[in-house]
Regions:
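Preference for bulky hydrophobic residues occupying beta-strand positions
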Residues: 27-29, 45, 58
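Broad gene-expression machinery/nucleic-acid interaction feature
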Residues: 40-42, 55
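Strand-helix-loop interaction patch of compact alpha/beta domains
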Residues: 1-39
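Hydrophobic, Leu/Ile/Phe/Ala-enriched alpha-helical segments that form helix-helix packing faces
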Residues: 6-14, 47, 116-123
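Domain-scale recognition of soluble eukaryotic interaction modules
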Residues: 55-124
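A short, structural micro-pattern
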Residues: 37, 52-53
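Proline-anchored loop/turn motifs at beta-strand termini and strand-loop-strand connectors
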Residues: 44-52
Length: 124
């Protein structure tokens, strides 16, 4: 399996995925939990060819929602400028939020979306 499989999985569960090149994908994401609930943002992910063995690292978020704060702790820290070339032109942020227990999941796009929801819920 590879990046194309994650793209297919995301599309199967209703996400309009765009392939940006350099291993990067993006899609509109309706935030349903936490203090940003009700907003639709763009989530960008750097997906390796080793999907689903390894998940994407943290998400790129656009527009910027939190102050850049690389040194602080979860849930308000680990916020950086964009790190993947296709996301740099549009601004936004990279949130250092790796999945905490990927091996304990089915390693699916649904599991990664659940992780995103957990990240947003922690910002309540």
């Amino acid at each position: 399996m590879a990046r194309a499989d994650m793209i297919r999985e995301l599309r199967e569960i209703g996400y309009a995925v765009q392939e940006l090149g350099d291993g990067c994908i993006s899609f509109p994401f309706a935030v349903t939990v936490g203090r940003f609930a009700g907003q639709t943002i763009t989530v960008g992910l750097l997906v390796g060819e080793d999907w689903p063995f390894n998940p994407p690292s943290g998400p790129h978020i656009s527009p910027s929602l939190l102050p850049i704060n690389p040194a602080a702790i979860w849930p308000h820290g680990g916020i950086h400028g964009p790190r993947c070339r296709p996301f740099m032109a549009g601004g936004g942020q990279y949130w250092s939020r790796p999945h905490p227990n990927w091996v304990g999941t089915k390693r699916s796009a649904r599991d990664y979306i659940a992780h995103l929801n957990m990240v947003f819920d922690a910002l309540a």
